[in-house]
């Protein structure tokens, strides 16, 4: 396949005002996408965004470009990424566009597309859009310009969709839940969803100002929610990231429940109800504890490359339904076409209600093994992973760890780094093993 110049694994992303994230490129991108998408279908595109101050600028630029290509545009305003995917499907739109840099700071932003079925845009369509980007922008004739409207009830539609994933015979009455919205796109959605299902909700990270998204709150900064759960004597906490496609949880003891543990809960619940199709897809970074816990239940487990795009690809290849990353991207293809933090939280709460169990009880049978990650910087064009010395160190550690441990060495795709990850039963031993391999990498760098 031809190498993509603009689109990465998750659309276009970068620092606002530099590189590709400029209003000029957004205008041209809207036009180029409109040219490709207008060849068939409804000629209707939905645009949603998170709460970054730059979102308004990019929304206007994309809107102008799409209209210039003859496509009608429907604006959602600040809404979670999975809400854009959902409403793209329900409105039978030709595509959905999300303006977000997910868990990144406010000064970054990004643009990604969903296809008409709510899944990530096909690689070939992205290549076609890139080809159009190389051409001069030519506006359609005035009578063919696209119209722009606003989806006034987008919030209500998505709230009802989320609630529809919770079993009608149960409620959340009696549960006190802390919900951290990361000052992001779920700020006006997530607290309402859990309140309407009956929970007492304490919302934090729900006051966006355009520049505080993901700032010391949310799924990538768990300190605040852990403190709040303990201070409020809450039953659990739910932390979302800036665009709402990622979730981490906290039990009543203030302990973090990560994506691997959430996958375990969902797989156990599906198996107990006889609806688990196949097994579970994790990634190369998934904790060995998840693998071992699923083995004990005779649930197959497979690993993809890191990234929810690759988890989705492997799920489709295996025809399985549940997969995700330890960072909190959770996919359940029986409940959506993309990662959805709110829905994943609802599914965990549904498992708690069905089994009349706490979050601690649902994760008690899964032992998270100590995991150490060491980053080693190297210089030059050579690949330290091809060194005999590094290979020998890895083989030695793997032999000593046996079946209760794991070693993963990989090169960073963005920096001159070798990432050394070691898992095992004993933290001090794991740390020593990781440093042994790291020293071998340093010696040949």
UniProtKB/Swiss-Prot annotation:
GO annotations of cellular component type? cytosol
Q: How is it modified after translation?
A: Activated by phosphorylation.
Pfam families xrefs: PGM_PMM_I, PGM_PMM_II, PGM_PMM_III, PGM_PMM_IV
Q: Which InterPro entries match?
A: A-D-PHexomutase_a/b/a-I (IPR005844), A-D-PHexomutase_a/b/a-I/II/III (IPR016055), A-D-PHexomutase_a/b/a-II (IPR005845), A-D-PHexomutase_a/b/a-III (IPR005846), A-D-PHexomutase_C (IPR005843), A-D-PHexomutase_C_sf (IPR036900), A-D-PHexomutase_CS (IPR016066), Alpha-D-phosphohexomutase_SF (IPR005841)
Q: Which residues form the active site?
A: 102
Q: Which cofactor does it need?
A: Mg(2+)
Superkingdom, according to UniProt?
A: Bacteria
Q: Which residues bind Mg(2+)?
A: 102, 241, 243, 245
Free-text comment on the cofactor:
Binds 1 Mg(2+) ion per subunit.
Q: Which UniProt keywords apply?
A: Isomerase, Magnesium, Metal-binding, Phosphoprotein
Reactions catalysed, as given in the entry: alpha-D-glucosamine 1-phosphate = D-glucosamine 6-phosphate
Q: Which GO terms describe its molecular function?
A: magnesium ion binding; phosphoglucosamine mutase activity; phosphomannomutase activity
The record's Gene Ontology biological-process terms are: carbohydrate metabolic process; peptidoglycan biosynthetic process; UDP-N-acetylglucosamine biosynthetic process
| Residue numbers carrying Phosphoserine | 102
Say which family it is in: Belongs to the phosphohexose mutase family.
The protein's matches in HAMAP family, at most eight in alphabetical order, are given as: GlmM_B
Q: What does this protein do?
A: Catalyzes the conversion of glucosamine-6-phosphate to glucosamine-1-phosphate.
Give the matching PANTHER family. PHOSPHOGLUCOMUTASE (ALPHA-D-GLUCOSE-1,6-BISPHOSPHATE-DEPENDENT) (PTHR42946:SF1), PHOSPHOHEXOSE MUTASE (PTHR42946)
Q: What is this protein called?
A: Phosphoglucosamine mutase 1
Q: Which organism is it from?
A: Shewanella baltica (strain OS185)
Please name the gene that encodes this protein: glmM1
